[in-house]
């Protein structure tokens, strides 16, 4: 049985549908990221799950019981969920220990159990040596750990996280990504994590839910959404792909600027119709001197390049601009005429 189920969940504001009839099921212990650009509806979805917003339509279920419907709504305090906000929202006048223990105090947990649970969480979040300090004496990463420990103190079934790392610098974000996932695996609760950051989603999630304009575009593992995007939006948003406009000739062949390409996977529009293909930057070959170029090659010229240590990125004009990642030792001057070879089995058709 799914731990969390959203059925036809909808939220409207004047002039806009923020969340548009989405369906989603999340299993016990799963880590799911809601990923998308600003305004796509991901935070609104999270706030409806938490009970801070009431849906206009649809239902929310937890462990088979309906907690939100058009006729009845379970209040937030009875949902056995915890939420971590972008601002952390820890109490500045309380010590680390007092902050972590506050939810247990509100639940009137016995003193001995409270101390035991707080001690365990302080150890798990590596805050045991900071227990008597105040938030103003902590780094941003330590404050985030306090928010995590406090959220876990009531032993929630579901942990909701709303852009929790956006206020941290890049190095701390990297550390905290692994820390959040480590705690998830240790305590085995269900996590719903909202982010606009593709790297966060790819490194943390069991599954990624990609949202756009209030709707779910694609659901899949990090590998699935990266390797097999089902739309032009997903391919562009996840990144690492070239998206090119082509004309479908028939079968698995397309026309790119007057040159035929075989496409190994994906969906295709009707013959003669315009469509898109996507191909990863590392799945395209740059041939400075191809001789007889062979199949699935198109001519182009180098517009620009960037040396990035481990590789070089080339921008090549093939009637459209394409980005190609090649080994660092491959050096081709700007303006050079080249051939670009597309690996058919790595090219994906996008009918929409």
Model-predicted segments: where are they?
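Helix-to-loop junction immediately C-terminal to a conserved catalytic motif
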Residues: 50
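Glycine/charge-rich catalytic "coupling/switch" loops of P-loop NTPases
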Residues: 255-305, 329-352
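ABC ATPase nucleotide-binding domain
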Residues: 5, 25, 61, 339-341
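The feature captures the beta-strand-to-loop junction immediately N-terminal to the Walker
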Residues: 35-37
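Pre-Walker A (P-loop) beta-loop-beta motif of ABC nucleotide-binding domains
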Residues: 22-33
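Conserved ABC transporter NBD signature motif
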Residues: 58-69
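ABC ATPase nucleotide-binding domains
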Residues: 76-82, 86, 90-233
């Amino acid at each position: 049985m799914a731990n969390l189920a959203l059925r036809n969940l909808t939220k409207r504001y004047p002039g806009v549908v923020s969340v548009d009839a989405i369906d989603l099921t999340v299993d016990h212990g799963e880590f799911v990221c809601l990923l998308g650009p600003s305004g796509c509806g991901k935070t609104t979805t999270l706030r409806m799950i938490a009970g801070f917003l009431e849906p206009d339509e649809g239902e929310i279920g937890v462990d088979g019981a309906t907690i939100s419907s058009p006729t009845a709504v379970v209040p937030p305090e009875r949902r056995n969920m915890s939420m971590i906000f972008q601002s952390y929202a820890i109490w500045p006048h309380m010590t680390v220990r007092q902050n972590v223990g506050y939810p247990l105090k509100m639940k009137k947990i016995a003193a001995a159990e409270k101390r035991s649970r707080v001690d365990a969480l302080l150890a798990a979040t590596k805050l045991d040596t900071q227990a008597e300090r105040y938030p103003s004496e902590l780094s941003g990463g330590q404050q985030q750990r306090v928010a995590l420990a406090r959220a876990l103190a009531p032993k929630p079934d579901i942990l909701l996280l709303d852009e929790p790392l956006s206020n941290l610098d890049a190095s701390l974000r990297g550390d905290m990504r692994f820390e959040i996932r480590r705690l998830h695996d240790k305590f085995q609760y269900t996590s719903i994590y909202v982010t606009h950051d593709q790297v966060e989603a790819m490194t943390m999630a069991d599954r990624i839910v990609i949202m756009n304009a209030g709707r779910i575009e694609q659901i899949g593992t990090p590998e699935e959404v990266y390797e097999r995007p089902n739309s032009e939006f997903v391919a562009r948003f996840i990144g690492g792909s070239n998206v090119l406009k082509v004309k479908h000739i028939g079968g698995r062949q397309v026309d790119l600027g007057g040159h035929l390409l075989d496409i190994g996977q994906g969906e295709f529009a009707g013959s003669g119709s315009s469509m898109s293909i996507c191909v990863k930057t590392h799945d395209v070959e740059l041939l400075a001197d191809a001789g007889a170029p062979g199949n699935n090659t198109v001519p182009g010229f180098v517009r620009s390049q960037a040396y990035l240590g481990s590789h070089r990125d080339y921008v090549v004009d093939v009637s459209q601009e394409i980005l190609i990642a090649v080994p660092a030792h491959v050096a081709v001057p700007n303006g050079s005429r080249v051939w670009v070879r597309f690996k058919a089995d790595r090219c994906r058709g996008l009918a929409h």
